[in-house]
């Protein structure tokens, strides 16, 4: 398991799950779709709770990944195999946590950063599943109250 410094245990598990999911699907990269699946696999993450409340789960996500990308021969990947966009999402999660003066980078920061990249495959999977990315982002950030409803 890789250690991502500054990230919570749940966020670390989600990032490592993203790597594992991409490996198992035989993909040669780790993209936003794998990050979404990694977040969904983290059963206790608050980002997962929000996604589940909207009807998204790991099975639906993995099916959508297979449909959109296909399946290859299982492979071995590392954090260097994150796509430039996914690396940007991870970097943005750090920026979001700092803006909140948070002492950690959690699953909600990863999810929020991904949702800001509306044209990524992770967001497209959510949209194709009938989930409004802008509304999800609004709910994640606390909506009009300005208070975050989900944290981990």
Please identify what each model-predicted range represents:
Residues 1-152:
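Histone-fold recognition with a strong bias for associated Lys/Arg-rich disordered tails
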């Amino acid at each position: 398991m890789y250690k991502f410094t500054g990230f919570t245990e749940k966020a670390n598990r989600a990032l490592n799950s993203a790597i594992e999911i991409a490996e198992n699907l035989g993909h040669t990269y780790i993209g936003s779709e794998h990050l979404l699946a990694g977040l969904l696999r983290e059963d206790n993450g608050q980002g997962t709770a929000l996604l589940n409340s909207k009807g998204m789960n790991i099975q639906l996500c993995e099916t959508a990944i297979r449909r959109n990308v296909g399946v290859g021969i299982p492979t071995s990947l590392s954090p260097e195999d994150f796509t430039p966009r996914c690396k940007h999402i991870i970097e943005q999660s750090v920026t979001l946590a700092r803006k909140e003066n948070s002492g950690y980078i959690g699953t909600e920061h990863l999810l929020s950063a991904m949702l800001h990249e509306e044209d990524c495959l992770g967001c497209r999977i959510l949209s194709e599943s009938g989930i409004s990315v802008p509304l999800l982002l609004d709910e994640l950030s606390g909506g009009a109250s300005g208070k975050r409803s989900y944290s981990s």
